[in-house]
């Protein structure tokens, strides 16, 4: 599965998803794009899941009909030490996530 790590997340998080093709927004040349434009560009680049900590995206963007889904990591901060405990649940969730869906990992 092709995963895109949002630019507000520590890029080392990608190393915790070894079973997937995981890239950061910066590496994929998608840094600086805002929510709607980022989703459009990520879909066009073939990404299936955007991993983010931005819990507002589902309220700001309609995901109906999109091929990309959102995996929102709900942690106290976007630091790796706070996100790392959520990774096992995130990896499990990737097995059941479908296009246009939003999953929150707490």
PLM features: residue spans?
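N-terminal first-folded block
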Residues: 1-48
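C-terminal structural segments of small proteins and small subunits
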Residues: 68-106
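Intrinsically disordered, low-complexity boundary segments flanking structured domains
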Residues: 9-13, 57-60, 90-92
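Active-site-adjacent beta-strand anchor residues
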Residues: 6, 53, 73
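Active-site regions of enzymes building and remodeling cell-envelope glycoconjugates
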Residues: 19-25, 66-73
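Short histidine/acidic/glycine/proline-rich micro-motifs that form metal-
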Residues: 28-29, 57, 76-78
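Acidic, metal-binding active-site segment of PIN/NYN-like and related structure-specific nucleases
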Residues: 42-63
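Short loop/helix-cap segments at secondary-structure boundaries that form the rim of catalytic
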Residues: 13-19, 59-66
